[in-house]
Amino acid sequence: MNRLDWQPRGLWYAAEGMPAEVWKDSLNKNPAAQYVSGPFDIVPLNDRDTLEYGGYTLRCIVTPGHTPGHMCLYIPEEKLLFSGDHVLFDITPNICAVAPGDDMLGEYLSSLEKIRKLDIAVTLPAHRGTGKVDVYSRIDALEAHHQKRLEEVLDIVRRSDGINAYTLTGLMRWNIRAKSWEDFPAGQKWFAMGEALAHIYRLCVLGKVRRQLLDDGHVVYHAV
C-alpha cells in the first residue's frame, strides 16, 4: 500500500466524523503510510494449500480479521500452529474495518472458530509471548473481549442517539497511556477509530444499530 492509497481512507474517516486535521496528522505520522511500495512478484495462496519447508508440510489456513488476507500455518503431525497476528496471547489483535460497512469483526470471530476446530498443542504467534494458556482458552478470552466491546458500543449508541463514529470512539475505554481522548497520539486515534468502526459495523450486521447517511455526507448511528 502506498501513500496515495491512504487518502480514500482518510476521506472515509472524515465522513465518520474524524476532523480533517486529525486524519491528515495520522497519515503524516503513520510509518506504514510513508513508504511507496514498488512492484514485486507474488505467489497467491489459498485455504488448505500446502507449503514444504525443512521436511515439514505446512497447511495454509485463511483467517481474515486482523487483515483481509491473513493466513495461519498449521503442521497437523506436530499439532503446531503459526498463528500470525490472528491469536496473540498478551494483547488483543487489532481488528479494524477496512471499507465502509464491512464486517471484519464478524470475519475475525468466524476465523477464531475455524482455528478452534484444529488439534493444536503448540501455538506460535507472530510477536510477543505465547502466554500461559492454551489456544482454546485464549480464543474464549478473545471472543469474550469482543462481546464486551460490542455491548459497550451498543450502550454508547443507545445513550447518544445520532452519534458519529469518531465521537463514539472517544467515549470508549482504551488501555493506553493518555489522560483523555484528546491526548491520544494521532496514530493511535487512527487505529482506535478503525477498531470502533469494526464493532459498529458488526452491530449493524446484527441488526442492533442503524447507519444513517446525512445530506452533508456525514454518517451517524442509531440504536434499533
What is the predicted function of each stretch?
Residues L45, T67-P68, D216-H218:
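Short acidic/glycine-enriched loop/turn segments that link adjacent beta-strands
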Residues D155-V224:
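C-terminal regulatory/interaction regions
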Residues M1-E52:
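Active-site HxH/HxHxD metal-binding segment of metal-dependent hydrolases
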Residues Y53, L73-I75, R211, A223:
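Conserved hydrophobic "DFG−1" position in protein kinase catalytic cores
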